[in-house]
UniProtKB/Swiss-Prot annotation:
Other facts noted in the record for this chain: Seems to be missing in strain 972.
Residues holding ATP: 413-416, 459-460, 511-512, 572-574
Domain DhaL: 384-587
Protein name (database record): Dihydroxyacetone kinase 2
This protein's encoding gene: dak2
Record GO biological process: glycerol catabolic process; glycerol metabolic process
GO terms for MF: ATP binding; glycerone kinase activity; triokinase activity
UniProt organism field: Schizosaccharomyces pombe (strain 972 / ATCC 24843) (Fission yeast)
Catalytic site positions: 223 (tele-hemiaminal-histidine intermediate)
Taxonomic lineage of the native organism: Eukaryota, Fungi, Dikarya, Ascomycota, Taphrinomycotina
Annotated ranges, domain DhaK: 8-344
Amino acid sequence: MSVKQFVSDGHIVRPYLLGLARSNPGLTVIEHDRVIYRTASAPGSGDLPKVTLVSGGGSGHEPTHAGFVGDGALDAVACGDIFASPSTKQIYSALKAVASPKGTLIIVKNYTGDIIHFGLAAERAKAAGMNVELVAVGDDVSVGKKRGALVGRRGLGATVLVHKIAGSAAALGLDLHQVAQVAQSVIDNAATIAASLDHCAVPGRKFETNLGPDEYEIGMGIHNEPGTFKSSPLPSIPELVTEMLSILFGEKNPDNSFVEFSSKDDVILLVNNMGGMSNLELGYATEVVSEQLAKRGIIPKRTMSGTFVTALNGPGFGITLVNASKATPDIFKYFDLPTTASGWNVSYHNAKDWEVLADGKVPTAPALEHTRNEKHSGVKADPKMFTKILKAAVDAINEFEPKTTWYDTIAGDGDCGTTLVNGGEAITKAINDKSIRLDDGVNGIDDLAYIVEDSMGGTSGGLYSIYLSALAKGVHESGDSELSVHTFAFASKYALDALFKYTRARKGFRTLIDAIQPFVETLNEGKGLDAAAKAATEGSEQTRKMDAVVGRASYVAKEELHKLDSEGGLPDPGAFALAAILNAIVEASEH
């Protein structure tokens, strides 16, 4: 993971709260005490009194806890320094800010500092005549029952479920004791296991880690505290999920089994990003978890996936399961109730909406099929020559892929070479499957356009597909009865003109156009295929000294584009690859 950090003195909690309130109307900040509360929950606000919920803890776990202040969730939060409990005074300030005649429930994660400070604040509030109860969230299963018998389970992902479910119960009018029971029922039936590739970086502090570059840790806490064990080499997400679930269900060691789950139980699943995982990988992990649960006969009735309880930028994720069948009877009603809390980043869905996933299967639809014209176009092609040309193009793609990728890593996003390889593999498969009409000059090229469109992503895939589609149309418009150099020259010009309708790139803009435009122009000047191929190469080479005008490379610093002085400069990867392909095509067609 990257250990670069913004320069910081570490004092960022207060401005964070102000920024949160600025972007979420209805919240008020007590700056001095680093407390944020729901404005409508304050005494005298005019709202009907209800049981209020107060939580908090060390900062660095955002959106927990402050992000869960809102209608149908928490009413106030006291924020400590990064990974440090707030003081008793801060917590008492939060309690006073939302004091209610209906009473207040304090929700705290089960960590020693939090328990002490929130417990003391609760006792002070009781002494002052306030009606308060406290519940401690402990859902971690990585530390077994024997080892953790004295301190109990740590509070992890289930914390936000307690915030939301208890908060909704309070919003619906339950009394303090009932709300506390709802919260406790979620805690008692929750199990969480987390894993991370590394420690997180704390603002204002030097990054430190005891994990090697090929190690990961199961059970790492949300304060950089050590996990239960390290392992290597780095796993795939499916491998890691298998390992995590075996611990959560006590399959690896019964001592880690705190909650029983069966195929008959209604379950809530939460897959939590610890802060540094990409949304793409998190969504992948969510599907992997769901698939592996299904193999155990467990189909969650509600699934949450997102960033809820973090360890700053921790590169890991957690899996939380709640056995809803053993929790409060109305748990799904409370779960589904809308909330304004920004941290509950789950789109609102009612119970009926969730029914579509009741069998555990995501609704899918078949791919839209391309209906192709099966009638021969009337333009003959030599199947052997067509095949030879295509194979030569694929061979060139594979041969020059490493260099294309290297160039694109410097000047772009590094996918130019692999994108072309994907297209080449699809073309090879189509040749073997006989799904390209190699005897048809129009339909065969049109087939290629669809293959490229389906297999090549990114800008280059779109450009190749447009060009090939127009090339097929150009062959048809030529009026020729069989493919020839003349036909190809006419169609190439037709295709280039079509391509120019969809891109502003022209020769000299440092794109693949610098290879294809000279090729087409030279061919249409009647100078032959060899001269056209040479022009494509020369056009590609000229990009080594050009500044990018369009495309991703236009955002890259000029000094990056001129790095490879030993080669005469850095060429445009797309032009470099296309020139190689065109040269291979010409060579194959003439020998």
